[in-house]
Amino acid sequence: MQMERPKLPDNKAEKLITFIYYKDLQKGIDFYGKTLGFPMEIDQGWCKIYRISEAGYVGVVDETRGMHKSHPVKPVQICLRVPDVDAFYKYCREIGVDELSEIFESQELKIKAFVFNDPEGYQVEIQQSIQ
């Protein structure tokens, strides 16, 4: 006899938060809040959550208090889909983000994009659809 799969609750997720772990929390606060200018939506003291889009958030966490530690290998990429990648590239070049790539296109992925690193070494990709 086959068991019936449980039904997903009707109350959908309100936010998707990606948590990244910082050795120096203030650097993350300055970068996401001041340099990139994202609004802080939730301040939990040792974790600051920034609104990146309507339901997408980045949580910057003090590694000494969070569930994980910062690690030299950063297998997470923060990706923002924007309507005008050229305008965002100009802005990032003007503010001097670390390891700013050239703009590139991928016909396979149907994107125009560039990448840079945040102060903790996480890669941030800014992309625009080209279809």
Task: Enumerate the predicted regions with their spans.
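Short secondary-structure junctions
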Residues: 37-43, 98-103
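A generic "binding-loop/recognition-motif" signal
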Residues: 25, 46, 56, 84-85
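Conserved short beta-strand elements that form part of the metal-binding/catalytic scaffold
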Residues: 39-73, 123-128
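A cross-family glycoside hydrolase active-site/sugar-binding cleft signature
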Residues: 19, 61, 79, 102, ...
